[in-house]
Amino acid sequence: MSAQLIDGKAVAEKLLEKVSAGVGERLAQGKRAPALAVILVGDNPASAVYVGSKKKACEKAGIRSVAYDLPASTSQQQLLEIIDGLNADDAVDGILVQLPLPEQIDPQAVIERIDPKKDVDGFHPYNVGRLAIKMPLMRPCTPRGVMTLLEEYGIDPKGKKAVIVGASNIVGRPQALEMLLARATVTVCHSATRNLAEEVAAADILVVGVGIPNFVKGEWVKPGAVVIDVGINRLDTGKLCGDVEFDAARERAGFITPVPGGVGPMTVATLLQNTLDSANLNA
């Protein structure tokens, strides 16, 4: 049996069309297009690629993007002052600071400085807290994108065993909260987890985000399980791969996301969905 591929690219396109239609509705009502401020500090090549793809997606959806490309020498205070200005600007709906940041800047201080209503990444403790108490406002992009993928493929987590491998603030923890919200029974695995293979083998829905190539072995996957691979790693050969052994897992799973073309496009599309939501909240 070979798993059905979950086509994140196609679902992301569909979501972008939906966002574009939402922008069109705003314009028809005489409102302005949503605006996203994107702040890049330094010249990390991977970050520059991510920022470029976000700008391109904004253009496609009719969202205005405002770029702040700052030198690597930017101080924390300078960055916080820029964020303060954007928080106060009624013409800006979303503020995104591309991570990682240079070592002189504390990322948590930066995340917490963003107005929670404009925190389109969904990283602010206020937004994570709201998700935890079943009152989501700005939902973290990757976990929300994963839930959209499941929905599109008719996969309902309710009553299922969801296993999350990785407990990062960006993916693992908020993903567990999203699954709880969808009424799954949730297990989170991390570096202190014993018998990882056993935990993975129990999963009806498996979400992996650890940043280690082929970390989860295909033979661990429960037959018929849904496998969502959030990892994206570049091997020495230049090839991209995920955190799950794809070929072996594909033979056992019911559904699986490829890398690339699975979760990645959903993260960007969800960012724009959040920006539109923010604009509509702020009227």
Swiss-Prot record:
The lineage of its organism: Bacteria, Pseudomonadati, Pseudomonadota, Betaproteobacteria, Neisseriales. This is Bifunctional protein FolD. Catalyzes the oxidation of 5,10-methylenetetrahydrofolate to 5,10-methenyltetrahydrofolate and then the hydrolysis of 5,10-methenyltetrahydrofolate to 10-formyltetrahydrofolate. One of its GO terms (biological process) is purine nucleotide biosynthetic process. The gene is folD. Homodimer. HAMAP family: THF_DHG_CYH (MF_01576). NADP(+) binds at residues 166-168, 191, 232. Keywords: Amino-acid biosynthesis, Histidine biosynthesis, Hydrolase, Methionine biosynthesis, Multifunctional enzyme, NADP, One-carbon metabolism, Oxidoreductase, Purine biosynthesis. CDD domains: NAD_bind_m-THF_DH_Cyclohyd (cd01080). It comes from the Bacteria. One of its GO terms (molecular function) is methenyltetrahydrofolate cyclohydrolase activity. Its EC number is 1.5.1.5, 3.5.4.9. One of its GO terms (cellular component) is cytosol. It catalyses: (6R)-5,10-methylene-5,6,7,8-tetrahydrofolate + NADP(+) = (6R)-5,10-methenyltetrahydrofolate + NADPH; (6R)-5,10-methenyltetrahydrofolate + H2O = (6R)-10-formyltetrahydrofolate + H(+). It comes from Chromobacterium violaceum (strain ATCC 12472 / DSM 30191 / JCM 1249 / CCUG 213 / NBRC 12614 / NCIMB 9131 / NCTC 9757 / MK).
